[in-house]
């Protein structure tokens, strides 16, 4: 095996890439449209349903409309193997599916906008279910384009970071932006405005360079079983004996964050902070702090390498929960402890954003160009599932231990994950045995 770029990372400029790499600006636009749909079928829509007088129980049940995001790996193999009708010939497989998915998101947003959950909730549910499917599909195909556009980890880190920045901007628009518009234009106007914002992604998809893998002859069509199984078989075969350790690392990487996040808002409320305090710090201040963590990850990975960054991400992501433990022990005076609250959220948000970009980059390097959407979708689901399950038990743990020891405990969860990351680094970090088939295009 040849030595991999993990060992000798190539210096890749982060800021100048926005102007010198023709993939970056489209990635920023595509990321922004990827960040819009989720909140519009989740938290933002919950606000509309509350205004419409829908019961709390029903609103809670309707949060399950986001299930498509958890199971998107199911239909991902078909997006990897088949071209979209008509558009595939013009834009290629990846960009063609992006336009199809964006069109679906726009259409569903218009459908929701012209509904009235107070009068006909079934209409809203139907279009929201379709919006969840279209939004999850959009995530898949954008990830597929990003992964197949560039392979070396140091370049993938830059592209992933700019895509993540776009996602955060879109998420801000669909969250705080949509709520502000709803106060001024009503909910119909807010959802129509979000649909109009999706046009940014249409332009970005047309301007985005076609991945070179899209220009190669596609593999022959296969049956249903082979289409679904082929990405899993290829990934496990390529990872070889290290597959269990690598997959366990991915499953555990975000586990501390998922478990801690479930109790973060309850902690803030328990400590006496108002809704305004929480919104100001977590949404406005937290947005900029998160961008800082994203910028740092995109700049650091090309300089120190993938595995050192992965180890830092595991340690920082879990150790940051000690700041939440400190707030639980010393921040119980509400507004009087506002700056303790702000610093705590800043530390946790910065570390979370940094670790997220590192993990996205690492999972992207594990996915092959042929099965990019399928394998990345599988890895993201593997990453989310264990933490989501444990998060459901977090309230019971807090009742037994209190907030302080709970967050100390979530930070300690990261210790075995960090040891596993170090072990994987030692065993495979100096070779390219787990890297996808050689493809070092810039």
Regions found by a protein language model. Give the residues of each.
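Juxtamembrane intracellular "pre-TM" segments in multi-pass secondary transporters
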Residues: 5-21, 212-246
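Helix-to-loop junctions at the C-terminal end of transmembrane segments
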Residues: 72-90, 292-308, 398-399
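Symmetry-related core transmembrane helices of the 12-TM Major Facilitator Superfamily/SLC fold
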Residues: 100-106, 189-207, 405-423
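Helix-loop boundary and gating motifs at the non-cytosolic
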Residues: 9-69, 243-249, 253-271, 279
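Transmembrane alpha-helices of Major Facilitator/SLC transporters
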Residues: 68, 72-75, 281-303, 313, ...
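C-terminal ends and interior cores of transmembrane alpha-helices
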Residues: 96-118, 315-334
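C-terminal transmembrane helical hairpin of 12-TM major facilitator-type secondary transporters
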Residues: 308-359
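Glycine-rich segments within core transmembrane alpha-helices of 12-TM secondary carriers
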Residues: 69-72, 157-182, 380-391
